[in-house]
Design a protein with these regions (language model features):
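Conserved N-terminal phosphate-binding loop of PLP-dependent enzymes in the Aspartate aminotransferase
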Residues: 1-391
Length: 391
């Protein structure tokens, strides 16, 4: 398998784009040179073709943003119809109302505001919590985007002032005592607890409910970051899956099958403070993404897409939810070998297996066959270097 055109484009990109791409997870820090495609040409269903013409079964699914499959006909039809009417206007469009109503029906939220990226939504939820409680500190668990408030407590915090870093504190998943210690150290100072409902491991019985109870007992809001789990774990997201309701929830990724849209949703009493804080985007009401979201969410609900993903992913390797499996590597050499050999065998997977509705049992069998064969090979490219840990 040759990557000549990909590497030529990478050389060009590095002259005008820092790291050669707009998204860290798609950069050369995550793809071994000489053994990887760097640029896509097109995609259809669960298939992706790179600029060299190589075909892959794509288990990355646009970093979980593709839930129905690339070029889904229902989403495409909705977007084409809206394109004839317009993309953005000088007034709001009724799609803002229709998609908000749909999200409320599916998730149990009472009010909704839109952003574009997951980071928009999580930052908005945190600002809203601070405004509502009058407090400054945040307890977090998981990955919540690139904004200063959360990235400052990771190893990639260059440019984040210490004063901002000092307001965010991490606790460990499935360790309620680690959260108790945070509240004990700073009583009456926390505005919110924000967390992913799960990523690599399942919550222990009652853990999410314990977190919510502890947050409320200390006067803090309970925020679930469902940017990835939303509409993937169940029609109503992880809240439905685990039988819990948060004060605020953030959504993104799968909500519009790849079109840029994110959401802050929650209880009306809290959400109405959005009228007082500043959370505003020129393109938050952009209509192609809203049309895509309306079609995507209706299809997810109508065809129970999460159930299909759950059943399809039952036998996949790794840890976590069957629709979002996390592969565990002994080190960077093992991960690089995995990428090298899976690419050679026409599998695109960057370390998590992100299923979409276009994947089939045949695709899962192909993944297993490629994985078994990859274990017999040797590394022929330079191993990737460690990067900052986000989960």
């Amino acid at each position: 398998m040759m990557f000549t055109k990909s590497e030529e484009l990478l050389d060009r990109a590095l002259k005008v784009i820092p790291n050669g791409t707009q998204t860290f997870s798609k950069s050369r820090t995550n793809l071994p040179l000489g053994a990887s495609p760097f640029y896509a040409a097109r995609a259809e269903g669960a298939r992706l073709w790179d600029v060299d013409g190589n075909e892959y079964t794509d288990f990355t699914s646009g970093l979980t943003a593709i839930i129905l499959g690339y070029n889904d006909p229902d989403v495409n039809a909705a977007v084409k119809e809206q394109l004839e009417c317009g993309v953005i206007f000088s007034l709001p469009h009724k799609l803002e109302i229709e998609v908000s109503e749909l999200i409320c029906e599916m998730t149990g939220a009472e009010m909704v505001r839109f952003g574009k990226n997951g980071s928009d939504a999580t930052a908005g939820a945190v600002r809203l919590a601070r405004a509502y409680t009058g407090r400054g500190h945040i307890a977090q668990c998981g990955y919540h985007g690139w904004q200063d408030w959360c990235i400052g407590v990771t190893g990639r915090n260059l440019g984040v002032p210490q004063a901002v870093r000092d307001l965010t504190h991490t606790f460990d998943y499935n360790d309620i005592d680690s959260l108790r210690r945070l509240f004990k150290d700073r009583p009456n100072q926390y505005a919110a607890v924000i967390m992913e409902p799960m990523n690599k491991e399942w919550p222990k019985d009652g853990f999410l409910h314990e977190v919510r109870e502890l947050a409320h007992a200390n006067g803090a809001l309970f925020i679930l970051d469902e940017v990835i789990t939303g509409f993937r774990f169940a029609v109503g997201g992880a809240q439905e899956h685990f039988g819990i309701q948060a004060d605020l929830v953030t959504y993104g990724k799968a909500i519009a099958n790849g079109y840029p849209l994110s959401v802050v949703a929650g209880k009306a009493e809290i959400m109405r403070r959005m009228e007082d804080i500043h959370f505003s985007f020129t393109n938050a009401g952009e209509c192609l993404s809203l049309a895509a979201a309306k079609a995507c969410l209706n299809k997810i609900r109508r065809e129970d897409v999460p159930k299909y993903l759950l059943l399809l992913g039952q036998d996949l390797p790794g840890t976590g939810h069957p629709s979002w499996r996390h592969l565990n590597f002994a080190g960077m050499e093992e991960k690089t070998l995995f990428l090298q050999e899976m690419h050679r065998r026409g599998i695109l997977c960057l370390g998590t297996i992100n299923l979409n509705y276009a994947h089939t049992h045949k695709d899962v069998e192909k993944f297993w066959q490629a994985l078994q064969a990859a274990r017999e090979e040797d590394l022929v490219c330079e191993p990737l270097k460690p990067i900052f840990k986000i989960r």
